[in-house]
Amino acid sequence: MNAPERIDSAARCANALRFLAADAVEQAKSGHPGAPMGMAEMAEVLWRRHLRHNPANPAWPDRDRFVLSNGHASMLQYALLHLTGYDLPMSQLRQFRQLHAATPGHPELGVTPGVETTTGPLGQGLANAVGMALAEKLLAATFNRPGFDIVDHHTYVFLGDGCLMEGLSHEACSLAGTLRLGKLICLYDDNGISIDGEVAGWFADDTPKRFAAYGWHVIADVDGHDAHALDAALHEAKAERDRPTLICCRTVIGKGAPAKAGGHDVHGAPLGAPEIAAMRTALGWEAEPFTVPADVADAWDARAQGAAREAEWEARFVSYCAAHPELAEEFVRRANGRLPEGFDAELMALLDAPSPLQGKIATRKASQLCLEALTPALPELLGGSADLTGSNLTNVKASVWVNHAGHGNYVSYGVREFGMAAAMNGIALHGGLIPYGGTFMTFSDYSRNAIRMAALMRLRVVHVLTHDSIGLGEDGPTHQPVEHAASLRLIPNNQVWRPCDGAETAYAWLAALRREDGPSCLVLSRQALMPFERNPAQRAEIARGGYVLRDVPAPRVVLIATGSEVEIAMRAALDLADAGIAARVVSMPCVELFYAQDVAYRDTVLPPGLPRVSVEAGGTWFWRGVVGEQGLALGIDTFGESAPAEALYQHFGLTPAHVAAAARVLLEEA
């Protein structure tokens, strides 16, 4: 093929993307045609000339990752996946944005083959990609050997003005530059338009200088519609191994639409039939909607090339298995997300024999002891903290800070809670590592949307959230969580653990690590908490999220508590016993898991008709659904105060005497 023919082919391939996007949005009567049309050449050059992938196997471990951070441009990705040969037939493109279709409004992991991450909240895809690139670097350092580059791929990102306006982009890109993630390549769709109009009025940053200051390699002022310029920029980016690269692509939003290109009206609404007809005429595109000319379909088909690339890697991996059998076995185990046999043995031994884990201990310290036992058995654990390591106690003796060379198992994320959480999602998405990260519970608000995305994507991610209540004392209401546990419990598919002692903390960690279909939040105390004795059945029932910790014959009331308030409930039960009132105590470290149990078990723990009192140093409205209309929820429905912890518990009425008195009043009113 000579140069003019190649240019013509490239243009037709790009136009196929334009028309599939425009026609799908038109049929759906909603969507975002402008960005897919403006990024068509960017996509054509990357996907046809650079991206290493195999449509027949979207899970090939050494594939390049592609992230569409500006997820509203989803029809661009669907068109690419269809044209290159993924299992996404044209019938699904026709069903764009329809119920149960494989082409939802924004890309969703697990719904569409070839989609690497769920995107839509701007900036999060970019931060996910930072996590993916970090995972690639760490795994390459772990598994590659001379002559055997088993882990050797790039992470590519498409992003727009909106992604860069989000504060998350600063957190993630600053971290990427610091860690020198040289195989992260971002293509910036610099079209100068957002929903409200021209961004010059609200986004006048010098983006190239901004990223240069982060330590990135910047390729500025690339014509985003010039295939040759884009190709050259990508070659330059791939040659840069020590710094992430930003390619600034000047584009026209909605390019190809004769009357609407370049304006904000094309961002988030169908073009309209007359405009699409005019575009077909202007671009000489004779194919009917949802039809791709044979020559264009052939030019896009990546199945043979993808199969050949994976076959070459497989052959190399076979040789790797022969040369490094133990490493190869470990690589396969971790790539498949399987935990090693007996990984929990040392931790369980701490519960079976006298150990500090069974003493009076802050649950944040208990968590650290759990990690000390687990880390040697789980090399895939990748820890970290948002500059609170000494407070969260997320590090262990075996922790090695991640360095520029990609060695280590602990990331100092800096004061970047949102960036940490979103990067952890990317690490989990990549595979081969299980990320956990720590911050103060009150700062989980910074991370919340990334935690929500982890729940939506069903990712194994662990958030260590310490200083969980007024128990942290004098730092005051800015640092004392009140509504946070309830807020996190509201996220579907998120499990929130608030353990009361070392044993519950150990079971919380085991549940979080064994959980393959969603994130877990470990809500841990600053202050030391009393341990509780349990028989084997009680200990096993911790894993069910809620269980009877103290039982009595013919109980008249059930006291339900979590975390540091379990001790208060136990002491209140003793006070009630002195008054002749039999009280059962239920510890409920994970409400979501408890309510996932069968009704029969739940009724044995919380017998219907028995009055209930809940005790938690946080908002009470969540617990009203647990205790019922006739029950009583004790907690804190205002902000905290700055004072010693003991004074605060007295001030807010969270003492054994207060709880016992409330239970007596409840029984008198029943």
From Swiss-Prot:
GO term, biological process aspect, one: pentose-phosphate shunt
Cofactor: Mg(2+); Ca(2+); Mn(2+); Co(2+)
Catalytic reaction annotation: D-sedoheptulose 7-phosphate + D-glyceraldehyde 3-phosphate = aldehydo-D-ribose 5-phosphate + D-xylulose 5-phosphate
Residues the entry annotates as binding thiamine diphosphate: 72, 120-122, 162, 191, 267, 443
Pathway connected to this protein: Carbohydrate biosynthesis; Calvin cycle
Keywords per UniProt: Calcium, Calvin cycle, Magnesium, Metal-binding, Thiamine pyrophosphate, Transferase
A GO MF label: metal ion binding
The UniProt record lists the keyword Metal-binding: yes
Any one GO cellular component localisation term in the record: cytosol
Cofactor note: Binds 1 Mg(2+) ion per subunit. Can also utilize other divalent metal cations, such as Ca(2+), Mn(2+) and Co(2+).
Record-linked SMART domains: Transket_pyr
Primary enzyme class: transferase
Site (Important for catalytic activity): 32, 267
Residues the entry annotates as binding substrate: 32, 267, 364, 391, 467, 475, 526
Pfam families named among the record's database cross-references: Transket_pyr (PF02779), Transketolase_C_1 (PF22613), Transketolase_N (PF00456)
Residues that bind Mg(2+): 161, 191, 193
Enzyme Commission number, as recorded: 2.2.1.1
Described function: Catalyzes the transfer of a two-carbon ketol group from a ketose donor to an aldose acceptor, via a covalent intermediate with the cofactor thiamine pyrophosphate.
Subunit composition and interactions: Homodimer.
Protein name: Transketolase, chromosomal
Source organism per UniProt: Cupriavidus necator (strain ATCC 17699 / DSM 428 / KCTC 22496 / NCIMB 10442 / H16 / Stanier 337) (Ralstonia eutropha)
